[in-house]
Structure formats: structure tokens, C-alpha cells
Design a protein with these regions (language model features):
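Active-site rim/loop-helix segments in enzyme catalytic domains that contact anionic ligands
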Residues: 1-105, 131-135
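Active-site adenylate/phosphate-handling loop in enzymes that bind or generate adenylated species
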Residues: 97-138
Length: 138
């Protein structure tokens, strides 16, 4: 499929952490929004890791919103899950916000982390989304 052949006006980006959406598919976001497609982003984890103080969460969210504004993103959702610990919480708590955003935005395409990504949070999101799509017959 070519990018110009998208038959719907909604795309969803699911990212583990603030900045993953821009680093992963920033150029693709710009292409789609430039075509008038509504791009929505769900950032699952809050960004509070050992390398950042809790106050950095607000700054990371502000930076994500600035980038989204530049890219003309429709909406950014911050789901507030624990950063670098998605493997330590029930998977249902990870999949619920994903399901909610898919139901709300009704995307034709969902972008998620690459299957070869080494980050544990990224791997979990990819695995859960793949399982969920198989269960729903996509």
C-alpha cells in the first residue's frame, strides 16, 4: 500500500515513552498530516525513569506536545503507565489504554515499535498489540 492510498482519515501512533513517536515515525507523521490525515498519538509510559527526576515528566510531556504541534498532530494522549516497568504490571493494564484509543480514533493504520527493538517496554507494547490484533482478526 502506498501512503497516498489510505482510505480513512485517522492514524494512531502508539509509543512507549515521550519522544519515541517522533524518533520512530516523525517523518511519516509529517507526511500524513500534510495530506490532511488525522494523526493521534498515545504515549503509554510517563517517562519517569532512574535517569530523570519526577519533575522531568512534565517537561517531557511539554516537549512531546510541542513536537506534536509542529507536526500538526490531532491529539496526544498521555496514559501515565510506569516507565521501564511495563513488564511488572498486569498486561491488561497496558492493553486497556491501547484498546480505548483504538475505539476512540478508529484508525486505519496503527504504528507501533519495531519488532527488533531492544527496549523491554517497546517489546511488550508490540507483542500485546500483535496479540490483540490477532484476537480481533486483523
Amino acid at each position: 500500500m502506498f501512503i497516498e492510498d489510505v482510505p480513512t482519515n485517522s492514524i494512531l501512533i502508539i509509543a512507549a515513552h515521550p519522544d519515541d513517536e517522533v524518533l520512530g515515525v516523525g517523518g511519516t507523521i509529517a507526511k500524513y498530516t500534510g495530506m490532511g490525515v488525522d494523526v493521534n498519538i498515545s504515549i503509554l509510559a510517563d517517562g519517569a525513569t532512574a535517569r530523570y527526576e519526577d519533575r522531568m515528566v512534565t517537561e517531557l510531556q511539554e516537549c512531546a506536545l510541542k513536537a506534536a504541534n509542529i507536526l500538526k498532530v490531532n491529539e496526544v494522549y498521555f496514559e501515565g503507565l510506569p516507565d521501564e516497568r511495563l513488564d511488572q504490571i498486569p498486561f491488561i493494564d497496558v492493553i486497556k489504554p491501547i484498546e480505548r484509543r483504538i475505539a476512540e480514533t478508529k484508525p486505519y493504520i496503527v504504528f507501533v515499535h519495531h519488532r527488533g527493538d531492544a527496549n523491554t517496554d517497546h517489546q511488550i507494547i508490540k507483542l500485546l498489540l500483535k496479540q490483540q490484533s490477532l484476537l480481533q482478526g486483523h
